[in-house]
Every structure is written in structure tokens, then in C-alpha cells.
Amino acid sequence: AKQEIMFYATQAREAYPYYQHERIGYNYRMSNICAGIGRGQMTVADAHVAHHKHTCDLYRELLKDVKGITLHENPSGRFDSNYWLNTIVLDPLLRVKGQENAYQATVQGAVGGAGGVTHVAVNAHTDCEPNANVEAMRMGLDAMGIESRPLWKPMHKQPVYKNCPAYVNGVSESLFKVGLCLPSGPYVTDRDIEYIVGGIRGLIER
């Protein structure tokens, strides 16, 4: 019973390398203490944003000559992203080592450092999932101790919402298939980023 309660209180995620919801869950975990800590964090918000922007700049510099990988950018000078999360997209034709083994087994537990309780997946595949090269990149980075994760699965493709109306144009599905989130937190160092990009480069088949 406790596990089931925690399952619903920690987003009700199934055991896939991306967010897969077959039941509606919640995120009921903030206490007054956590709220107080959040207020305290506002005093370092500017420093964190500056760090995130620096992190993106370094990813951009180190990935600029890697064919088949694109780092997200501001669409124009009218935008000023805080880059709280850095994401890349992989060209579907990019070959990644081990992609023939992607989705050969179900995931055990949460992925990418996420907490909470997950249900055991019945099948490694769903009707909407990242491309094999994206999953291979995630798995390869994980083997190096690097946490990464696919982009968020579109809400209208979550089983729990399958009977709900949706107005779509295909963009969210196409991005989900090719996108990968990279470590971007305030404690990610320049050396960490160099290691991460080295891992990405090493996983690409030449």
C-alpha cells in the first residue's frame, strides 16, 4: 500500500526511459520547509541563470563541429532563455554505438536521477518513443555515469489521456523522437561538460 501511495504521489510514472503515464498521478512533495528553502534560493537565482547560460555556451562551443547533433538555441534576439535545461536533437540518420540494442529490455526503476516509485513495464516499446539512436545515446552516457533523459513525452500520447481531445500538428511527437536532455544543473562544472561532450563524441559511429 505504501509503494502504491508513493507511486501516485510521485507522478505515477511507468518504468520507461521517458515519462510514460497510464494512470493520473501528482507531485505532492513540497512542505513548508521546502517552500522556505525555495525562497532562500531566490537570492542566488541570478547567479544560477548566469551559470546555465555559460553551460549552454560551452556545450555549443564543444558540439559545434559534431555532425548530426544540434543544440537548442534562442529563435532570435527577441528571446532570452534562462537555459535551465540544455537539450540536443539527434539527426535520425546519425549512427550511435549500440543502437541495435535499444529497447531490447525494459527499464528497471526511474531514469535520469528521477526519484519516486515506478511500475514495472510490460513491454519495452510504446506507440510513441524516442528513436533508437537517442535511446542508445542515453544508455551509452548512463554507462559512463552521465545522467541524460529524453524530452518530455507529448501529453496526448500518454495512455492516461488517450481518450481526451487534442489539437496537434506533429511537432511535439517529432521533437520527442529526436531530443535528449543533458546535465545542466548549477553544480555542473566545465570539466563535467567536457567529459559529457567527450562521451557523446565517443558514442557516435564513424
Question: Language-model features: where?
Answer:
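PLP-dependent aminotransferase class I/II
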Residues: K2-R206
